[in-house]
Amino acid sequence: MIITEIIGNIHEQPELRTHHAETITLVDDALTKRIQRLVSDHGSELGLRLPSGHPPLRDGDVLHSDGENSILIAVAPTDVLMIRPGTLRDMAFVAHSLGNRHLPAQFDGDVMIVRYDNTVVDFLEHYGVRYERRSTVMPTPFRHSEHTH
């Protein structure tokens, strides 16, 4: 079966829930790939061929449904560092320093979130910056931004 569109998302459209659901668990990097071969937890094989410019896959996306059975995307937890600098100056310093490494980052309120990296931990500990290591399902995948020097 070739999937060319997302039917909806069970978190936003509960009516898409069915009695039987197969799950395809994807890691962060796979969420942005619009063409890939997938296998569900029940062994069903699918081809994904989404149009160019399609947004990343999300937890709860419905790839197939016949009313009784469905195939859903589940996002695997990502190992991340939740960075909580104490001052605005510290946040600017951390953001600038990690930005120079071209690390993809996300922000949630006053928390900077990056994928776990032992060199980042060494940096944070060296400068006394508060952080917490956590495994969590990210709402959007980490992405590298385009840049030139």
UniProtKB/Swiss-Prot annotation:
Coiled-coil residues: none
Signal sequence region: none
CDD domains found in the cross-reference section: UreE (cd00571)
GO-annotated biological processes: protein folding; protein-containing complex assembly; urea metabolic process
Subcellular compartments: Cytoplasm
Gene3D superfamilies hit by this protein: Urease metallochaperone UreE, N-terminal domain, UreE, C-terminal domain
InterPro entries the UniProt entry points to: UreE, UreE_C_dom, UreE_N, UreE_N_sf
GO cellular component: cytoplasm
Keywords from the named record: Chaperone, Cytoplasm, Nickel, Nickel insertion
GO molecular function annotation: nickel cation binding; unfolded protein binding
Pfam families linked: UreE_C, UreE_N
Function in brief: Involved in urease metallocenter assembly. Binds nickel. Probably functions as a nickel donor during metallocenter assembly.
Family, per entry: Belongs to the UreE family.
Protein name per Swiss-Prot or TrEMBL: Urease accessory protein UreE
Organism: Corynebacterium efficiens (strain DSM 44549 / YS-314 / AJ 12310 / JCM 11189 / NBRC 100395)
Upper classification of the organism: Bacteria, Bacillati, Actinomycetota, Actinomycetes, Mycobacteriales
Gene it is expressed from: ureE
